[in-house]
Amino acid sequence: MTAPVTVVGEVLIDILRSRDGDAVEHVGGSPANEAIGLARLGHPTRLATYFGTDPRGTRIANLMSREGIRLTPPSQQAPRTSTATAALDADGVAHYEFDLAWHFEMDRLELRRDEHVHTGSIAAALRPGREAVLEAVLRAREHSTISYDPNIRPALMGRPDQVLPMVERFVSCSDVVKASEDDVEWLYGDTPLPQVLDRWTELGASIGAITRGDEAMAISALGEHRWFQPPKVTVTDTVGAGDSAMAGLLSGLLDAGLLGGTFARERLRSTTWAVVQAAVARSLACAAITVSRSGANPPRRSQLPPSAA
């Protein structure tokens, strides 16, 4: 069995409005999507989060139970369950409006040794919860590997110059960092992607990944940059694509024994490109399957092509 994973971050209800105005609700939130993605790929997963006991919250709790994800206490104590309303443009790209409640009690989170801890998105960006999340990550890093996905939401996070210092603080705590090209452009302007990856490496990340939609994913590892082309698919929408990519990447690294405790961190730093490439192949396959379906609906391991399973 691979190392267990604790995901720290928000869960909410995605309200997806199609171009014809119809609305469909899905459980979402980047960290929650990543937790579901990891669980569906066979990894024991916990979610430390914050949502309500209203009907939407009950839907979330029931889904996590069905997916085999354990909620850490006190996850279900919010006054209401957060929502993100996504409207699709002509290209199927989602644009969001948020109604959020986020709070995190680090002292109530019991972190285990030799597990992997993942965080990012709104939970790692909005005060006051972000300071508690950062403290939890710093504490976990003493005995666990860390991954981070900033998943930038400009409407919520302020100006890039206000956000970048906190993003880089999380990067400096992390072994694996993944962001989208849009995230990187918002944070770093016109800085070339290889320079951004080099910056993450300087801060301490062993693997950096930048997704680029249907263009090649940029990967930094072992002192090199490489580019990996995603599979060609018919896109239904892009909701949850980056989350599935992150879950797939972590899954591949977990299977290789490169995430977990401090010994896994050393193995990650000295791995080979063949191992990294296998994890990237799973990442790209997971994202491709997700964009071919409506909403954030990551694949199960049995649905992956043999080359990525």
Predicted stretch roles:
Residues 13, 17, 53, 152-154, ...:
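Short, glycine/acidic-enriched loop or turn micro-motifs at the edges of active sites
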Residues 1-4, 189-309:
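Conserved phosphate-binding/catalytic region of the ribokinase-like
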Residues 15, 43-126, 146, 306-309:
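Conserved N-terminal subdomain of the carbohydrate kinase-like
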Residues 1-70, 294:
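Glycine-rich phosphate/adenosyl-contacting loop at the front of the ribokinase-like
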Residues 36, 83-87, 216-219:
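Short beta-strand scaffold segments in enzyme catalytic cores
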Residues 116-198, 205, 214-216:
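Conserved beta-alpha-beta core of the PfkB/ribokinase-like small-molecule kinase fold
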Residues 38, 180, 242:
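Short, conserved phosphate/pyrophosphate- and ester-handling motifs at nucleotide-, phospho-/glycolipid
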